[in-house]
């Protein structure tokens, strides 16, 4: 990546204390060797009826080692089934959900918890509004898309599928931060 700055703009950035590594998209010390080899890519989906659920299920179907889930609302049967299928293939699946999922009438939280997937409730916030999956430490699924039937069929939503191990590492660290203060959920 190459950025061009006029001399006054560069001087102003440096004098303001703005970290030059941010402007250039590099972290101090550079990225890990594996991250340097990969080129980030992304796909975008929109709903209603834009293939968001299908994209999530496809990504979960390709998971090999880990799936970390953070969700506000989780009622999608196809996504819940894809998580269980991944766990049955030996993928380590962990789920953190908003506290509303304890009482939601049609939550898939009970299904995945009863299937043996470690499920936690994040009650430390007014709402735990993240909609994120981190797959195999390289792929992030995120956007406004809730993992629900309504999000696929009725709502105006978006989903990004991002291939970027450096960004995935940051999302995984945030997931862990929330998992650490969340309570285990065994289902109803």
Name each model-derived stretch.
Residues 9-21:
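Bacterial N-terminal signal peptides
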Residues 56-118:
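Primarily the HKD phosphodiesterase
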């Amino acid at each position: 990546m190459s950025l061009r700055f006029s001399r006054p703009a560069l001087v102003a950035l440096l004098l303001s204390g703005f970290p030059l590594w941010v402007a250039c998209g590099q972290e101090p010390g550079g990225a890990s060797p594996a991250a340097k080899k990969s080129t980030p890519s992304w796909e975008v989906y929109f709903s209603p009826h834009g293939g968001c659920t299908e994209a999530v299920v496809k990504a979960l179907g390709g998971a090999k080692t880990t799936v970390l889930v953070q969700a506000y609302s989780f009622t999608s049967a196809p996504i819940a089934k894809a998580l269980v299928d991944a766990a049955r293939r030996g993928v380590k699946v962990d789920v953190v959900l908003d506290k509303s999922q304890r009482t939601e009438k049609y939550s898939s939280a009970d299904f995945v918890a009863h299937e043996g997937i470690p499920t936690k409730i994040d009650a430390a916030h007014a709402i735990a509004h993240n909609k994120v999956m981190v797959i195999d430490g390289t792929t992030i699924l995120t956007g406004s898309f809730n993992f629900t039937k309504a999000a696929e069929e009725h709502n105006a939503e978006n989903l990004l599928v991002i291939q970027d191990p450096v960004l995935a590492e940051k999302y995984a660290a945030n997931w862990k931060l929330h998992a650490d203060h969340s309570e285990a959920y065994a289902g109803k």
